[in-house]
Structure formats: structure tokens, C-alpha cells
UniProtKB/Swiss-Prot annotation:
Effect of a null allele: Inactivation of this gene leads to the constitutive expression of the mannitol operon.
Keyword hit for Ligase: no
Domain of life of the source: Bacteria
Family per record: Belongs to the MtlR/FumE family.
Organism: Escherichia coli (strain K12)
Key words of the record: Repressor, Transcription, Transcription regulation
Record protein name field: Mannitol operon repressor
Disulphide bridges: none
InterPro entries recorded: MtlR-like (IPR007761), MtlR-like_sf (IPR038026)
Pfam families in the record: MtlR
PANTHER family hit by this protein: FUMARASE E-RELATED
Record's function text: Involved in the repression of the expression of the mannitol mtlADR operon. Does not bind the operator/promoter regulatory region of this operon. Therefore, seems to belong to a new class of transcription factors in bacteria that may regulate gene expression indirectly, perhaps as a part of a larger transcriptional complex.
Subunit and interaction comment: Homodimer. Can also form higher level multimer aggregates.
Length: 195
């Protein structure tokens, strides 16, 4: 009788574990979405995106290594330290890509985001989300299904024209925020060496 009761309870435990995992996933996605949405300029948006990407990659890299305290303190931390061989985000990305933890599209998207952020660090110009210098690279990201097409502007009515431009900029920005939220969430929720 006790065995039957335990068998009956097990599916509920699995359900509650799945629900807890789904809630954690949703909470993480919400945090990423909020942080990306807070960036009002292209520069702040990309800085935040690469910071979140770095956090996601760091979680994956740590899964690859042993978990005992001695190994972490004396072997893993020096590798990941700023001047260690895995101190650079690009090197950590290559490691998890080479180990098959992330796929080629995720790897290429991460590298492109880092390159775009680096380019903006050296460029003193402020760009809008709809500038060609931003739309071009974002259009190459695998995580972006499609950027919204530019509307056919009617410059005759200046208030309508301004509204159309603002609406288009917001649509492009929202597409970028949602696409990068999905990319970063997918990477951070991966489990090393599990299919």
C-alpha cells in the first residue's frame, strides 16, 4: 500500500520539478529582457548584451570543469582569471563551441555581437537602432529571424513622418531585444555535455 502511494506521488514530484525549472527559466529570461530593454542607446544595449552573454558563457564553462573545492581554487580559477588562458570571452566561446556545448550559429552570433560592441567602443558616433551601420550586422545574426521592413515614409505630413520613423525604430529595437534575449537565454540554460 505504501509503495502504491509513493508511485502515485512521484509524477507530482516530477511535475513540480518541471514547473520549478520552467519558473527559473522564465525568471532568467525576464531578467535578461529587463536589462536589455534598459539600454536606450545602441552602445548601452550592446554593452549590456555582451555582459549578459559573458555571464551565460561563464556558467557553461564552469560546468565543464570539476566541482570540488580544490580543483576550482587551484586549477579552474587561474584558468578563468583575467590574465589566465581562458580569461578572454572569445577564448571561452571557442572552448565551449569546440566541445560541442553551443552550436555554430550561437558561436557566430556571439562573436558578431562582440565585434560590433568592440567597433562601437572605437567609434565616437552615436547610432540609432535603424542606422545601416547597426542594421547590417544585426541582419547577419542567426538569432534574428527577420528585421521589420522599413515603412514607406510620407514626408508630406511632418507629424505622420515623425510618428512612422519612431514606430519603425521601436519595432527594430524590440526585435533586437527579443532576439538577443532568446540567444542569451538559450546559451545560459544549456547543460554541458547533455543533449
Amino acid at each position: 500500500m505504501v509503495d502504491q502511494a509513493q508511485d502515485t506521488l512521484r509524477p507530482n514530484n516530477r511535475l513540480s520539478d518541471m514547473q520549478a525549472t520552467m519558473e527559473q527559466t522564465q525568471a532568467f529570461e525576464n531578467r535578461v529582457l529587463e536589462r536589455l530593454n534598459a539600454g536606450k542607446t545602441v552602445r548601452s544595449f550592446l554593452i549590456t548584451a555582451v555582459e549578459l552573454l559573458t555571464e551565460a558563457v561563464n556558467l557553461l564553462v564552469l560546468q565543464v570543469f570539476r566541482k570540488d573545492d580544490y580543483a576550482v581554487k587551484y586549477a579552474v580559477e587561474p584558468l578563468l582569471d583575467g590574465d589566465g588562458p581562458l580569461g578572454d570571452l572569445s577564448v571561452r566561446l571557442k572552448l565551449i563551441y569546440g566541445l560541442g556545448v553551443i552550436n555554430r550559429q550561437e558561436y557566430e552570433d556571439a562573436e558578431l555581437l562582440m565585434a560590433l560592441r568592440e567597433e562601437l567602443n572605437h567609434d565616437g558616433n552615436e547610432y540609432a537602432f535603424t542606422d545601416d551601420e547597426i542594421l547590417g550586422p544585426f541582419g547577419e545574426l542567426h538569432c534574428v529571424a527577420a528585421l521589420p521592413p522599413p515603412p514607406q515614409f510620407e514626408p508630406a505630413d511632418s507629424s505622420l513622418y515623425a510618428m512612422q520613423i519612431q514606430r519603425y525604430q521601436q519595432a527594430v529595437r524590440s526585435t533586437m531585444v527579443l532576439s538577443l534575449t532568446e540567444l542569451i537565454s538559450k546559451i545560459s540554460l544549456k547543460k554541458a555535455f547533455q543533449k
